[in-house]
């Protein structure tokens, strides 16, 4: 569970203790506010959860109720895609931008999520393939 992952980091990985403590506090607030069982939400070893793999503080800051049902749901594709778009926008992504260089807004917004150049390059390459496929379907 997300709770177990963060709790373990607090007690077993001293260099991540402060970070994990803050994330656990965010997670507990989220569970309390949405009346969720802290042990029922599965996540990664780092405490990320949902289809978008948000850490608790990012979920708090960037998640949106895109389907307008009154709840931000980490396992609802509508909310997740809206939340990911919100995350990218809040981290500098500009609609209709086509600058994929390291100095461009697109690159920087993806890099804000994962500080690994290889990750960003893979996401941008996949983006281009999806865009080409969509354009091909529209012709």
PLM region spans:
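Catalytic glycan-binding domains that act on GlcNAc-containing polysaccharides
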Residues: 1-137
